[in-house]
């Protein structure tokens, strides 16, 4: 976007790829933990899922157990996936299944069950960004309302676990 705004490019291709299925579960866990603050969260039981479990526990302590809400979200997401021919997971899982701990839906890192967590899989996405004059001549185009880059404090010990200040800040100027 910077290159287009500076008139150094008229069209750009942005590509993102993630290949996770060719490495061991241990390696995947280590890669994902790279998105946390390793000096403090590197040994968290359950790995990166354990970091989110810590956040969920703090949220439940503050607002009450909301496991049923997580199950409703999981069931809704699976239902939406069934309606999307491009969705990775196209299997309907009902609320009762998502809200129960079982052999097929165990705790990954309590209180998070398998249906509360994303799958380890491969994926890719691409986006073409164009100068407004070129984009307006296309049959289908979108415009960005805003663009924002913010940082958040990574160590959970240095912030309120139930708040994501970076996400909040990113919405200020929309």
Regions found by a protein language model. Give the residues of each.
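Acyl-CoA/ACP chain-elongation machinery
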Residues: 16-17, 22-24, 28, 74-88, ...
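Conserved catalytic cysteine-centered active-site region
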Residues: 1-11, 19-51, 90-119, 150-152, ...
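Condensing-enzyme catalytic core mediating Claisen C-C bond formation in acyl metabolism
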Residues: 30-31, 39, 62, 71-75, ...
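Active-site-proximal alpha-helical scaffold in enzymes
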Residues: 1-18, 50-84, 127-133
